[in-house]
Amino acid sequence: MLLTPKMFSSWLRQDVKKILKRKDSDAGERGKALEDLRASLFNRFRSPETPKRQQQQQHRICGPTVALTFNFVVAISIIFMNKWVLKNIGFEFPVFLTFIHYIVAYLLMALLKSFSLLPASPPSTKSSLLPLYTLGIVMSLSTGLANVSLKYNSVGFYQMAKIAVTPSIVFAEFLWYRKRVSFMKVVSLTVVSVGVAVATVTDLQFSLFGACVAFAWIIPSATNKILWSNMQQRENWTALALMWKTTPITLLFLVSMIPFLDPPGALSFNWSLTNTSAILVSALLGFFLQWSGALALGATSAITHVVLGQFKTCVLLLGNYYIFGSNSGFISVGGAFVAIMGTSLYTYLNTRGQSLKTSSSSSALSEKKSRFSDLKDDDKNLEPYGSEAV
């Protein structure tokens, strides 16, 4: 049978149609698979359970030891960097420097959000908006007033004011959350406070305005730490998600503080490449300081974070004495050692309390499991009579 050109062309068209149809079906299946994958990923990352899961993952990856170590290293680094910026470069605008820190932090978080790397936030309700606004306002007051206090007061007076934050946190947490502190922890906190006071008593230089700023900073600082800790532990916020929500509010209030607390002339500053680079490095460290502080507060408590700050002061004082040969005096060095002993005692009490909680919870869980297995055994024994029961 001869194959005519017309028959050949018709067969060819049929084959092409079959191939195209098969390709369309394959493409449709592939597109459907991609849509299903996209939907599953969206549900996984944006479901109501996602913030809680991400917070649990944050605690697994960054536990108390990692978070406190991270915050300790970054805090010491930014102290030297900010000292370089404020003294050597001559950037005498502490609130504006804080504003730059938060601007850089917000840009970095926006970059993370554009790549879908920013953790999801818990569902917003009317009752959850008030703590967010409160935290944003308190953060602006805490960080802004802290830098102003460092400008007008010595480091010793700044640390003496920080001692008052510890009893403020204990009193506020008792009023708001009915948290109680054991007698031994009160003793260890007292030892830490006395040690820091003795260590910094030789460096108490302040002005009247600086003293007013330092005492005005105590309540916002204590409130800031309490809110950061409790919003992460009770409302399933991660550190970065909470920073993303509160930073715009903080920036708004920092702008309103600049005319009252900063001298004029920030825009006429010598913005050379060296000066700008130093300020940007300080801002980058500021982002890491805020992030590490949030991680530490979420993993531990507000009091533990304050104790870490006082321990950092004593380590810096001893480092200057032993490494750089600074003449701090034997009284200051002795006070630093006393404060470190109090910090060690507080850490031991916290660790023992957490281990006791873990053991009690595990024993309670095993007891529940044993009771459940006993009930299952009883059901199995009664099973032959179950069909006759009415």
From Swiss-Prot:
Residues 356-365 have a biased composition (Low complexity). It is a multi-pass membrane protein. The lineage of its organism: Eukaryota, Viridiplantae, Streptophyta, Embryophyta, Tracheophyta. It holds the Pfam family TPT. This is Nucleotide-sugar uncharacterized transporter 1. GO terms for cellular component: membrane. It is found in: Membrane. Keywords: Membrane, Sugar transport, Transmembrane, Transmembrane helix, Transport. It comes from Arabidopsis thaliana. The keyword Transport applies. Residues 366-382 have a biased composition (Basic and acidic residues). The chain crosses the membrane at residues 61-81, 89-109, 128-148, 155-175, 182-201, 206-228, 249-269, 278-298, 306-326, 329-349. The keyword Transmembrane helix applies. Belongs to the TPT transporter family. TPT (TC 2.A.7.9) subfamily. Residues 356-390 are annotated as: Disordered. InterPro entries: Sugar_P_trans_dom (IPR004853), TPT_transporter (IPR050186).
